[in-house]
A protein has these predicted regions:
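Hydrophobic/small residue at the entry helix of a nucleotide-binding pocket
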Residues: 33
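Conserved S-adenosyl-L-methionine
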Residues: 43-48, 136
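Conserved N-terminal Rossmann-fold NAD(P)-binding element of oxidoreductases
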Residues: 27-29, 52
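Glycine-rich phosphate-binding loop and adjoining beta1-alpha1-beta2 segment
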Residues: 51-88
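Conserved SAM/SAH-binding loop
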Residues: 98-106
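Glycine-rich phosphate/adenylate-binding loop
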Residues: 21, 109-116, 121-126, 136, ...
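N-terminal charged helix/coil linker that caps or initiates catalytic domains
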Residues: 1-25
């Protein structure tokens, strides 16, 4: 008898489907990559998703974020994601936190309750805190590094942070993690050289760029790659839902 995940079962088997259905995954950050991760995991039959983001959907999100539609403008990202995900799989458990992850809010989350953590947050201090807490709890974590100002999705790569190249964010994070004795971390990053041009032309005048640029096929590809890593790691691991 067919169900929503019958085609996936042909690929991963009944045991794989059961592993995913028991998995509890947290996604911190629902921007372009994070929102795609959450949706992709839902389409893989993951049993429980916890979504954390403090932002609301704006018009500028439409170009790069799967949650952003004219009908969702002004909605919190976590609520838009929950509604969309429950429309994909009505049986999935979705927990949402409309909050900014930092020292003040970190206590809200018992990280040991998760089988896997995905970090797609843009704030360096939040990333470092989450990575550190996840390591303390011995919870697998994958971190998406800076993919802004990139236009070539074929240059995206998953690697240990020690093997990254052409990524200024990786150098900073490596340095900070070493201070905590952390030398290994699975990350997604781009091998594309960062843009050197800090100015862009607007009405015949060179002005400083107000923010980093992004584009749908880079953020979307990043999300798919992250989700793929999570799913493959869960399938290759032992029992999940240890809590």
């Amino acid at each position: 008898m067919q169900d929503a995940f019958s085609r996936m079962e042909l690929l991963v088997g009944n045991t794989g489907v059961k592993k995913l259905s028991r998995a509890k995954i947290a996604v911190f950050g629902l921007g372009g990559a994070g929102s795609q991760v959450a949706e992709s995991l839902a389409r893989c039959g993951v049993g429980s998703l916890t979504l954390i983001d403090h932002e609301k959907i704006t018009l500028t999100n439409i170009g790069s974020q799967v949650l952003a539609l004219h009908s969702t403008l002004g909605m919190s990202k976590v609520e838009a994601a929950k509604k969309r995900i429950r429309d994909i799989d009505e049986n999935i458990l979705v927990h949402t936190y409309e909050t900014f992850y930092n020292e003040e809010t970190a206590g809200m989350f018992e990280l040991r309750s998760f089988d896997y953590i995905v970090d797609t947050m843009g704030t360096l201090s939040s990333k470092l805190l989450l990575i550190s807490r996840a390591r303390e709890g011995r919870v697998p974590v994958i971190s998406c590094l800076d993919i802004g100002d990139k236009i070539d999705p074929s240059r995206l790569e998953v690697a240990d942070i020690s093997r990254t190249t052409a990524c200024p964010a990786a150098r900073i994070i490596k340095k900070e993690l070493r201070k905590q004795g952390i030398r290994k971390l699975k990350v997604l990053y781009s091998r594309e050289q960062p843009a050197k041009e800090k100015l862009f032309r607007r009405r015949r005048t060179m002005v400083k760029k107000p923010a980093k640029g992004n584009i749908s096929f880079v953020t979307g590809t990043a999300g798919y790659l992250l989700a793929g890593e999570v799913v493959r790691d869960i399938l290759s691991a032992g029992n999940v839902s240890h809590s």
